[in-house]
């Protein structure tokens, strides 16, 4: 049973990160990648399965009870709202940081992501290197994890704006980077909201 909980937790973390990155990109005023973003939105898994109308007849003739599942769905809906609100807030924070990202850094990252022979690990390293460069130049008036998260999301936005065809690649690279490096912070945000 513990294994199932752990696997579900990882899948849930991935869905939360997907929703966070997607919500951030949706909150951006830049429409140059809107079509690609809409297409990506149709491919993303939902946070929780939809149990609406799921009423199965059991072998004993009774209807199955999904009160627990209904509660999970309701919790997930409120969780989705919380994550979307966090994404909107991070996009607002990102707007104030947007101009601090050098176009040359975005161009270089876009070129690296465009190279299809590079592994996902290489892409994560490329994103990490770009973030390290930005973090060195950025003032420390915000906690490091929040700064890293906002800058990673901003880099995804900037690359997608620069080259809309890279949206899917930069989205998945950003989700993987966040899940590998900022998972605990994102879990905390999802649990506590934006404090």
Swiss-Prot record:
| Swiss-Prot/TrEMBL site (Cleavage) positions | 60-61, 75-76, 99-100
Subcellular location per the Swiss-Prot or TrEMBL entry: Cytoplasm; Mitochondrion membrane; Mitochondrion outer membrane
Q: Which GO terms describe its molecular function?
A: cysteine-type endopeptidase regulator activity involved in apoptotic process; death receptor binding; ubiquitin protein ligase binding
Q: Where is this motif: BH3?
A: 86-100
Key words of the record: Acetylation, Apoptosis, Cytoplasm, Membrane, Mitochondrion, Mitochondrion outer membrane, Phosphoprotein, Ubl conjugation
User: Phosphotyrosine (modified residue): where?
Assistant: 54
Q: Name one Pfam family in it.
A: BID
The answer to whether keyword Manganese applies is: no
The terms describing its cellular component in GO are: cytosol; membrane; mitochondrial outer membrane; mitochondrion
Q: How does it assemble?
A: Forms heterodimers either with the pro-apoptotic protein BAX or the anti-apoptotic protein BCL2. Interacts with PLEKHN1.
Fill in the domain comment: Intact BH3 motif is required by BIK, BID, BAK, BAD and BAX for their pro-apoptotic activity and for their interaction with anti-apoptotic members of the Bcl-2 family.
Q: State the name under which the record lists this protein.
A: BH3-interacting domain death agonist
Organism encoding this protein: Homo sapiens
